[in-house]
C-alpha cells in the first residue's frame, strides 16, 4: 500500500493549534488545489470530543467559507480527521497559512455567537447520520481554546520523517 503524505510527517513534533499545507496539486486544466491540515490539538496528547468535533463539522464548514472563499479561493471540503485532532480542508486556490489561520480564528468567533443548539445547520435525521450526537457547549469550549491559544504554522520541512525512521516503522 502506498505511504500517504499525512504519514510522512512526525506527529510527535506537531504544534497545535496550527495550520499546515498538507499537499499541493493541480487539476489537468492547471487549477491549484491545496489541502490544509488544521490541527486543533497535539496528536497523542489531546483529542476533540466526539460531540464537539461533530458539531464543529457542521458549523466550521460554513463559517470558514464565509471568511476564506473569494475570487481566488473556493473551499471544496472540510472534514474531521479520524484521529479527532483536527480537520482537513481541501480548496481550489493557494491562500497563505496566515490567511487560513485568520479565517479559522474568525470562524471560532462565529461558533461562540451561536446561541442555541437548534441553530446548528443540518441538525436533523434527514441531513445528518448521527443527528443526536452534538454538543454546542463542547464545540464552543473547543473554539474558546483555539482563540486563547492562537494559531501557529507547522511546516513540512520541520516535521518530515527521515527515510531511516520511515524504513524502520
Curated annotation (Swiss-Prot):
Q: Which cofactor does it need?
A: Fe cation
Which keywords fit this entry according to its UniProt record? Answer: Autoinducer synthesis, Iron, Lyase, Metal-binding, Quorum sensing
Describe cofactor binding as the record notes it. Binds 1 Fe cation per subunit.
GO BP of this protein: quorum sensing
Q: Which SUPFAM superfamilies match?
A: LuxS/MPP-like metallohydrolase
Assembly and interaction partners: Homodimer.
| Official protein name in the record | S-ribosylhomocysteine lyase
Q: Which species is listed as the source?
A: Shewanella baltica (strain OS155 / ATCC BAA-1091)
Q: Which gene encodes it?
A: luxS
Amino acid at each position: 500500500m502506498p505511504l500517504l503524505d499525512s504519514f510522512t510527517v512526525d506527529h510527535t513534533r506537531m504544534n497545535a493549534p496550527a495550520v499546515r499545507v498538507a499537499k499541493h496539486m493541480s487539476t489537468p486544466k492547471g487549477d491549484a488545489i491545496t489541502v490544509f491540515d488544521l490541527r486543533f490539538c497535539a496528536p497523542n496528547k489531546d483529542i476533540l470530543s466526539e460531540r464537539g468535533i461533530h458539531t464543529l463539522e457542521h458549523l466550521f464548514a460554513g463559517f470558514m467559507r464565509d471568511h476564506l472563499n473569494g475570487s481566488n479561493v473556493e473551499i471544496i471540503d472540510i472534514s474531521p480527521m479520524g484521529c479527532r485532532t483536527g480537520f482537513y480542508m481541501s480548496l481550489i486556490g493557494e491562500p497563505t497559512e496566515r490567511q487560513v489561520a485568520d479565517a479559522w480564528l474568525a470562524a471560532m468567533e462565529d461558533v461562540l455567537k451561536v446561541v442555541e443548539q437548534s441553530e446548528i445547520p443540518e441538525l436533523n435525521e434527514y441531513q445528518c447520520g448521527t443527528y443526536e450526537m452534538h454538543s454546542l457547549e463542547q464545540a464552543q469550549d473547543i473554539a474558546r481554546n483555539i482563540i486563547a491559544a492562537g494559531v501557529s504554522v507547522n511546516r513540512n520541512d520541520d516535521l518530515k520523517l527521515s527515510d531511516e525512521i520511515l524504513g524502520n516503522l
